[in-house]
């Protein structure tokens, strides 16, 4: 869908240049106006697909789990990274978290937010050894203590779950 949007956007730009070259006002250029409506419909369709996906995913997660542990990410700061900005805004993380939160309230589920500074990808989920900071290009690593091989994302998700359950048990004790 993204390729189609780009192609239609290029057509719109070409139609604008052609109208400008012929000295026609863009409000009077019929082909430009038709293409503009077509591009707007594509943007709306993409937005509806993303919203539908987020609604279905959040509903599925909430219905199948009593406790959800998520990392409290700084999405505004992450959007400043030009290489990540498009993929982060496409995923719409903050919208997903909002949907999870209101559906959790609706269904009586609990969402535990883990601090963004928690070193989830640095800790071995097997033995608890903190291996230190790693650059983002390192996708998997082996713990020097227990020699367990970890995928960075799966290990981080296990650590986030463990930390969330620890926070939950501390809250129950009080």
What are these regions (language model features)?
Residues 1-174:
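Positively charged, helix-rich recognition surfaces that bind polyanionic ligands
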